[in-house]
């Protein structure tokens, strides 16, 4: 697996409308010899043959490809966050017994959140790939729905466990349920909300890599393809990129959280 793959090569004969005078930035054309095993039809034995081919070499081409795939994985994560936000808000209010409008809404919200948490993202992604095909749509829905279930549970439990005295004081002066929630509950649970959200965002980035293995887009799909073709240098490049991306994201989240809390 070492050294990691950095450059990217492509046979000139397979590139349509290639202008040798206007090559991509930092690219060049060189001649390479490739040894291939072919069967001799006369002896019916495998023999090594050497072929000379012209290839277009992009010195950092594969690094750029991995970067684009990581951006796609980031978009999966952001799309899942948007889906999660739309799903979790009504459940966050209706799931706690203290803020639920009635018993039926409370039971329905609890059941829905439990249903979303019960199925792992990988299994959900497999079914969504069958429904929507290969691509990021299946990944966004799988990550978003599963994360909505977890955050719905965490948020609701924090609301239920919040100190009742500020809420009782607001209700005593005639505040409604929404104002009581906004002024009496949210300030108490906001630090926990930030911590839970940061954790789920970090987890979604790692899970976006995993669900890409089943065709749901992102860097995981590229990782599986290179692994299946035994291109372990490319696999090492992808693993390094994932580590760097997660490390940088973790540092940014730590700084943001320190400023907000």
UniProtKB/Swiss-Prot annotation:
The chain crosses the membrane at residues 122-142, 203-220, 229-249. InterPro entries: MetI-like, MetI-like_sf. One of its GO terms (biological process) is transmembrane transport. SUPFAM superfamilies: MetI-like. It is a multi-pass membrane protein. The keyword Ligase does not apply. One of its GO terms (cellular component) is plasma membrane. It comes from the Bacteria. Pfam families: BPD_transp_1. Its main location: membrane. Keywords: Cell inner membrane, Cell membrane, Membrane, Transmembrane, Transmembrane helix, Transport. Gene3D superfamilies: MetI-like. Residues 47-253 form the ABC transmembrane type-1 domain. Belongs to the binding-protein-dependent transport system permease family. Probably forms part of a binding-protein-dependent hypophosphite transporter. This is Putative phosphite transport system permease protein HtxE.
């Amino acid at each position: 697996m070492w050294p990691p793959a950095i450059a990217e090569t492509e046979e000139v004969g397979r590139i349509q409308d290639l202008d040798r005078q206007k090559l991509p930035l930092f690219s060049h054309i060189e001649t390479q010899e490739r040894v291939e095993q072919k069967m001799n039809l006369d002896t019916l034995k495998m023999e090594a043959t050497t072929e000379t081919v012209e290839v277009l070499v992009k010195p950092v081409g594969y690094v750029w490809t991995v970067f684009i795939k990581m951006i796609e994985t980031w978009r999966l994560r952001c799309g899942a966050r948007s889906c999660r936000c739309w799903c979790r808000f009504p459940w966050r209010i209706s799931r706690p017994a203290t803020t639920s409008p009635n018993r039926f809404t409370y039971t329905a919200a609890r059941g829905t959140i439990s249903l979303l948490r019960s199925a792992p993202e990988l299994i959900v992604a497999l079914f969504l790939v069958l429904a929507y095909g290969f691509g990021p749509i299946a990944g966004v829905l799988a990550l978003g729905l599963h994360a909505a279930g977890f955050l719905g549970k965490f948020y609701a439990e924090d609301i239920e466990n919040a100190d009742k005295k500020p809420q009782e004081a607001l209700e005593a002066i005639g505040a409604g349920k929404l104002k009581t929630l906004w002024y009496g509950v949210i300030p108490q649970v906001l630090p926990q909300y930030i911590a839970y959200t940061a954790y789920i965002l970090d987890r979604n980035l790692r899970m976006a890599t995993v669900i890409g293995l089943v065709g749901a887009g992102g860097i995981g799909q590229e990782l599986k393809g290179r692994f299946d073709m035994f291109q372990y240098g490319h696999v090492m490049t992808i693993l390094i990129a994932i580590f760097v991306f997660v490390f940088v994201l973790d540092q940014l989240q730590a700084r943001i959280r320190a400023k907000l809390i």
